[in-house]
Amino acid sequence: MSSSSNSDPSSSPDNTDFIPLKDNPKDTSSYINKKNPFVNDSFDSHDDSYLDNVNPFEYNVADDEDTISMTSDGVEFHNLGITETVDEQDKILSELQLAYPTVSRYSETLDKGLLNGDKTTKGDYTSLRRFRKPFLFDKLSPYFTHFFSEIYAAVLRVVGPPRANETPGRNLPFSPILRQIYNHPLYNIFIFVVIVLHAVLLMIRSDDPHDKSQTIDYLIIVIGILYTLEMLLKIYLFGFLYDGSSSFYDFINSYTKKTPRTMSYLRHSWNRVDFVAIVALWISVIGKKQQGIFRLFSMIACLRLTRLLNITRKTETILKSLKESSTPLVQVVSFNAFFGVMIAILGVQFFKASLNRQCVWLGDYGDQYLPTGQFCGGHWENGIKRAYLDKNGFPSNVNPRGFICAEKSVCRVVENPYSNTVSFDNFFNSLELIFVIMSSNGFTDIMYDIMDAEYFVSCLLFIISAYFLTLWLMSLVIAVVTSSFIDLQHSGKNQKEQKSVDKHLIRNKLCEKYLFYSNFIWISFIVAQFVTLCTQTYDQTSSTANRYLIFYACVDFLLAAEVILRFFAYLPDYRLFFRRYTNLVDIVLAVLNLVTLLPSIRKNPVAFGWLSIFAIARIYRCILLIPYTRKIAKLLFSNFKQLLNLMLFLVIVLFIASLCAVRLFQDLPNDGDSDDDAISFATTYESFLYMYQILTSENWTDVMFAIQARLAHLHLSWIPGAFFTLWFLFSNNVVLSMFIAVIQVNFAPSESDLKMEQLKMYLARLLRNYNPFQASLTLNALIKRNGSRKGKTVDESHYEWLYEDNIIKGFLRVTNIPPKEPLKPSLDTSPELSKYSLAKLSNNFKRFVMRDDPFSQAYFKRVIGIRWEKDMNLKTAAKDMQAAKAFVRIKQTEFLKNHPKYNDVFWVIKPSNRIRRFCQRLVMPGVNERYGGVEPYQWVYRVIQVFIYACILTAVIIECIATPIYERDHLLNDKQHAWFVWTEVAFATIFTIEAAIKIIADGFCITPNAYLRSTWNCIDFFVLVTLWINLYAVLTSHALLSRAFRAFKALRVLRLINLTQTSQRMFHDALISGFFKIFSAAVVSATLLIPFALWAKNVFGGLLYSCNDDNVLSASQCVLEYASTPNNWEVWAPRVWSNPPDYDFDRFPHALLALFEIASIEGWVDIMRSVMDITGFNNQPQTNASSGNAMFFVLFNLVSMIYILTLFIAIIISNYAERTGSAFFTAEQRAWLELRRKIKSMRPSKRPAIRPLGLRGLCYDFAVQKHGIWRRTFTGLYIVHLLFLLTIFYPCPIAYTYVRNSIFLILSICYTINICVKVYGLSFYYFFHSFWNMFDVVVTLGSLTCNIAILAKFENRSLTLLQTTLLVLVTVHLIPKFDNFDQLSKTVVASLPSIFSLIATWIVLYITFAIAFNQIFGLTKLGLNGGPNKNFRSIRNALVLLFTMTFGEGWNDVMHDYTISYPNCVNGDDFYNSDCGNKPWAYGLFIAWNIISMYIFVNMFITVVFDNFSYIHTKSSSFTNLQRNDFRQFKDSWAPFDPMVTGYIPKRNAVKFVLSLRGVYDFRIYRDEHTLRSIISKVQSKTGQQSVPMLENPLMGSEINLEALDQIIDTIDVNVVKERRNVLNSLCTEIMTLPGNVISFSNILMLVVLHKIVDHREAFPISDYIRRAYVLSELEKSIRMEKLLGLVETSIIRKTFLQHMEEKKKALENPFILLSEVSEILPETPIQEVLRQHNADPEQLLMSTRTPSVSDRSFSIVESTVPTIASGEGDDNHSVEDHLKVPTDNEPRRSPSLKEVLLRGSHSLHSNNDRTSFDIEAGFGTAESDFQFGGATEDINRIADRIDDYLDRDSFKG
């Protein structure tokens, strides 16, 4: 096949037909200059990372020659920087040895360079896209050429990824001509223009659907024809499903992903999208007026526009990350959907027919019928509670519950909300509401409606679902996307070359000083202007406005002059001035601010308000001046380009989604509700706003429910439900997670610094000796018998050993370390301060005013910090710590000598005072060790602490009971004898006595162990003071004083955090250690809120006023009264001209509060709709009169959502990761930690080791086979079971309910049979060892019993709910049936400890704030957002309301309800007679809870899940090849050694077990082909004896082929055998050093993995590595010593044996002794002694094992680095010092010297407990070594090395 071109392809050397491929299947790097920066040599299949290497608009003229290539005919080509990649489909062609000369897609010239390249990358073939340079470009600048290349590259990305052209197997008519058309650049440009035109036409049609709809429809049909022709052209050239390049069999196999893909049309994802869109387009054209279901196809046709997402390289990279995360994302979403389905089924059974009951007002005479919208469960009738009425008006047969309607109204069944589309009546509606819960927005209204219709406890299902589904499982979705995107960011970051930044200095020193010092002056002008803008109001007088204007003009001209002066300061290097971005920004701001002073702008308040942003933007200089904000801002904006690309991606996605929504929901019929009809998708702009609203999750359910209601009559309500749900899931959970990933990357350290950061953190832990919780013992400590903290001394030599160069080098994997490696671990969170910063000046002032206190923790930090600044390295870290402590102790002694009264309590009570010593015997010191005192009696102290804890718990319970309403009711009757008042007095007295004892024991504030030095004591003292003040106010009836201080009593609940150590640590990590970072994030957020608030005040100040009468047009008409119709009742009311009740922008504080609420993604839609209705000053708002104003809030909401919410999440994730150390873990270390967690959780198989026979053996197979027919059958039954559960609905016919219950009974019987089969096959013992089996028994028998009872007519509501719950629990068996679900479930379980500790801390805060809210607002009247259960009048209501505010659900509306004041409430003289709110307390408490719970703890929850999930999906480790089958194989090998499934085997069997392992765990020294039997069978002569002889004499009767034997021996690698023997020696020795006579399953698995698979140098964190290095060094010493002693013992035995033989010879030569008497006369030989000790013969000796006792000390990795499950999680439960401590011998023992051993022989080492047998097959020997190594270690090592060489040399001799 040939093609006509300028250069005949037949002239090529091979005279081979060329194929102009769109995807060249050969490497074309041969014709590209190697200096070309656009070439990437490591392209993967469909890898578009090369796009990151093409940096647009950074073009170097010098590189023009590298980007231009010439062909043989002189045609010039320009490099586009786009590689063409295809899969391995061309391997078939390469095997056929077909030549691949091709032409460029943009020229017919033969590219001979393709013949030279044959390099592939991972089996893929890549080339470089080029375009033919027109002749006109020679006249233009190369910059224009590069710019054109970037534009054309964008065109190619949108049109589609370049693919290969027709394959050699196709030869169709007209293909050359069509190929030329397809290869022409104008064709690509034309297709790009068509796609853009399609988007424009759709937007125009949506904005004007009536006038131009017919014309645009015709144009869209034309575009559809063009799309179809393009598709047919591709199909003709490439084939539809089969391209003909290979056999049809290979084509079928290509779908298995094991063989390369073909070039056919549908084998590429973008072509499949195009095909679906084109087919949907023609279906929508056929449909009549695009109504009904045809709307769906019209929407699908818009998917062709998704190609616009490839417009830039970065957006294409984002798509790539989404594609890479698609598989785990689908798995996680499926896992979440499974649990969502389970809860949806429960929702149907629990809450069916609950939302169709409302209170109906009947009127005074029963002649009215007005549904009130209040859900109910009964009504009052003549003072008696009655059940609700059914739809026919008859009473129901259920008990009244929930909200009881008032008199003259009834609770009656009506239609479900939103045209019967919102309910729990069937599975699909229930599943929709469950997803609403998972979205964490819009579910609280449904929850309170259910609580009104049912019982209060109904909220538990919503609370559990919200925490489990939303915070726990949905966090996995965020973790998948974030992990994938972070990995992509790191890969791109590693590929980028660091650009060198030239630091130019100003030559004139005077100018440099001027720039530095004058900066403060100019910033003061900026601050003054900013403050002035804040004080300016919209209603100021004209004279005031002129003064403000004059001031603004002066400041603007001064700052403009400052820019000019700054420019002259840079001279003569004026270019340096323009290289600084701040200078360029200041120039632009100066010019624009001068422009705003023009009269035409100044006199227009709207334009002046919008342009005031340029004056406000100068505040950035203040942000950069403060070190705190500058550091965070730099981290935040360090990846600013990536954030902009993400914003571009988000905008494009929003635009396409808006067009799709318009095509679906434009011109929908109204359902009659005016509120729902206001939601319209009539235009693209409206659709854009609604789609963005759903993205932010703010009231997104209102949009979905309203559209569903309008489509309900067409039975198409499922379309908006599915559409909006998918859009919410993609936009809110996927796209926004990418912003978190971008910001988080900025906070993460580089890969090269991770291990060094671990070292720094490790030293920081060593030096940190301050514990803020030391004042109180935890509950765990109180229940222990011995609670004294015994100091454990650590030998200094161990520290020296830890910091040896070889240890540090081994961890860092470097060969050279500087002699003094600077290491400055951070003991505090304060950043580095600049020389003239305010914080630095403040610290200096404090040091000048306050004297140094050597007893404070800050003093120790400062001392060690000075040492670090001078000279600090890894070796001297421990010595520096000890020196600093000694120095501080000396300073403390000197300080007390100089200030003898310092340790006297109140300068009176001396340390020797008896009362003080008595008090010291009762309590522990607040901080540090007690100086100059006595230690407390432990039991007395414990009793006191238990009593105090009991008092705290009792006080909390009383506070939950004695609410303000309860107190008011009792105080009105008897104020003097109210029991709760006197209990408060009693508790206050007890806590006062406790504080007094502590103060007398250790002092109040200035003594070494003062009371107020402890954080918790400060909180206790503050609570105690407020408690007495509140008691005084209550007893004296001081209302204002009582209300001001009564909330502080809730702080005592914080003492409950001390109940567990994990909650202590979690509280410390969340609120204390990360306080500074969170505060910094808050400051940075404020720098964003404040400028926007000021801008909003200038733009919208005074424009939100409106009249409550919609019929007036201006403020002048808003007078007198009008007929108001609340609840359809006409009432005359006065007209009022006012702002909205909860927000306005008239003052700066009001604007700041409004924007803070918007930043929490709450309430911004209402504010946006208000500003969209603005018509002008003093004019009545009109709907969408100023719709463009909405973009202000869209912009602010997007920026705040990205830079505030994601900033908080990223900082909290970073802080938690740094505290736990996971932030500095490498990929290998993360994988190891995950593997360690897996191993610790593994248990032996719960089944017999030997398969029974007969029928029981068959049952055994059914029980143990993972993929057998029996298991698959029951998996199918579980799926059928789940499908029948989905058929529960209301109203359901009784007959179908009976049939369904019968089916469930049959299934339960099948499950019971399955249990019986398992029990019979495994036996009771093994069956009940499994948790799943016990769970199966309980659930199956419970469901069977319930089914029988229900079918036997014993049905009631409680039994039905129990039956459904048990049936739903049966479906849990599907989780272990699928590997993905099983793995994700283990991820969830792995995070349980951290989650529970977080929840425990969270619950304490819940109770604290619930009591505070109840004490302050327990009597406040209900507002518009309140309800029967939505209030703070009881603790349970307060807890539920706090739960809703945790998810941001209407927290701002509730807050404004509790700011109510007089005259809208009753403000009585007494607290109990007032129902007003409290504005300071409302703002303080609500905002504090919003920040602590919503911003911190919710993100901590996500962080914990993310931290565990990242370990599961780590794929870059060297031991990820461990599969589930490998662990199963290990369990199978374990089973024969542990037949009773105890999880332990004796140590004497450990070596046999290790040698029995196969596969990846194989520890045999010689493999199967090199065993003795295998070698004998191969070397025996054919004429000799063919059977293998007995092992006692293997060569007897055989003829050996010595030549074959030599060949086999030559194949044995001596080094490999030596390495295997060393590994086996080390493993067995470490096993024997473990304490006890048995070893557990997890411990031996851990040791096997450590010795065989894991490289501790790469995989271990620093603490584990140090411990492991010590263990290995001790093992090496032990093994060397064993070899030495073995040699000595062998020598002695040989000498004894020779003496024995000599004596025997002499005895035989003696003629007076008979031969039979020789054995009786001669002494017993050492070998016979050994055999006698073991009661064995020589044959048994070969199989015997021994238990070497290398040392009485246990230094195994199992006991240190990897603790048992009971001990916790390594470093989390133990201090770092514990990892460094090596156990010492408790009992002294005799330690013979090496000289004694060598002179006296091995008899000096033997004892009665010595076991000297050894395993010949294992090839190692050990002996007891009870002496210290001392200084003879080097000699021993040299001797052992010689022994090794001798043994290795002799082992293979001959």
From Swiss-Prot:
GO terms for molecular function: stretch-activated, monoatomic cation-selective, calcium channel activity; voltage-gated calcium channel activity. It is found in: Cell membrane. Residues 1771-1790 have a biased composition (Basic and acidic residues). Residues 1-33, 1764-1792 are annotated as: Disordered. The keyword Ion transport applies. It holds the Pfam family Ion_trans. InterPro entries: Ion_trans_dom, VDCC_alpha-1_subunit, VDCCAlpha1, Volt_channel_dom_sf. Belongs to the calcium channel alpha-1 subunit (TC 1.A.1.11) family. This is Calcium-channel protein cch1. It comes from Schizosaccharomyces pombe (strain 972 / ATCC 24843). The lineage of its organism: Eukaryota, Fungi, Dikarya, Ascomycota, Taphrinomycotina.
